[in-house]
Amino acid sequence: MTDTTAASAEAAAPPQLGILTQYIKDLSFENPNAPASLSQQGKQPDITIQINVGATNLGGTDFEVMLAIEGKAMAEDKVLFALELAYAGVFRIENVPQDSLHPFVMIECPRLLFPFAREIVASATRNGGFPPLMLDPVDFVGLYRQNMARQAEQQQQSKPN
């Protein structure tokens, strides 16, 4: 097989994504006003959720991708609970063109991690004495585009005139 044949066979290979491991990096659940906060059952709390994605190249084709989830439930001016979860996985990604690698890592990998992180959040809130917090599905394509637009805007603002 010649070099050109090997190169074209490599280019034709389908993208491959392997999950090597996944894990909780950090988990915090605070219930600062318990047991009084647990008696708020009739009132609907104001719940805010923030989800961010980060990735680190571990060398070669291996990437650590982390979902950072922060949630807070408030009733009037009191915190019912505060939750922070950093859930990560190590992925081996092969045969993805370089120009598609960043969106692939930042969209497909978090999409695979999310159901596991969602279950951890639901269990933590349930174990904290509250109804399980079931996170809505996340549009990781939209989140990626939003983050890219924010980065472009920050770069524009930091350029000298």
Curated annotation (Swiss-Prot):
This protein's record includes keyword Transcription regulation: no
UniProt keyword Protein transport, yes or no: yes
Subcellular location: Cytoplasm
GO biological process: protein folding; protein tetramerization; protein transport
GO cellular component term of the entry, any: cytoplasm
Gene Ontology molecular functions: unfolded protein binding
Xref: SUPFAM superfamilies: SecB-like (SSF54611)
Alphabetized UniProt keyword annotations: Chaperone, Cytoplasm, Protein transport, Translocation, Transport
NCBIfam families per record: PRK05751.1-3, secB
Family listed: Belongs to the SecB family.
Task performed by this protein: One of the proteins required for the normal export of preproteins out of the cell cytoplasm. It is a molecular chaperone that binds to a subset of precursor proteins, maintaining them in a translocation-competent state. It also specifically binds to its receptor SecA.
Subunit composition and interactions: Homotetramer, a dimer of dimers. One homotetramer interacts with 1 SecA dimer.
Name of this protein: Protein-export protein SecB
